[in-house]
Amino acid sequence: KETAAAKFERQHIDSNPSSVSSSNYCNQMMKSRNLTQGRCKPVNTFVHESLADVQAVCSQKNVACKNGQTNCYQSYSTMSITDCRETGSSKYPNCAYKTTQAKKHIIVACEGNPYVPVHYDASV
């Protein structure tokens, strides 16, 4: 079974994007990372930093998660990210996404030993 940490990595880490500048990036990535199996995942963020840099956020600024839990952490520095958002015309199995690039602080929920990201909470 896929661990929560491995799932986070599959869903959110793309350290060396080949074609992030392309408007097709989200359509390709959401499919290749299995985020369109059974349904179209409505929103997803990919972080273009090393896994080590993203894991390090778990020892940075402690903040409350959207759901009120206290195990979320905000990155001290901005990170290069791409937001993928389902378009109005998207219909499973032909999931369609809008690709938006940004540089933002990321907020992740961390748990376990080692203490690693298991959920992507927000970007600010």
Swiss-Prot record:
The active site is at H12, H119. Keywords: Disulfide bond, Endonuclease, Glycoprotein, Hydrolase, Lyase, Nuclease, Secreted. Its main location: secreted. GO terms for cellular component: extracellular region. Substrate binds at K7, R10, K41, P42, V43, N44, T45, K66, R85. It is an enzyme of class 4 (lyase). Transmembrane segments: none annotated. Signal peptide: none annotated. Monomer. Interacts with and forms tight 1:1 complexes with RNH1. Dimerization of two such complexes may occur. Interaction with RNH1 inhibits this protein. This is Ribonuclease pancreatic. The gene is RNASE1.
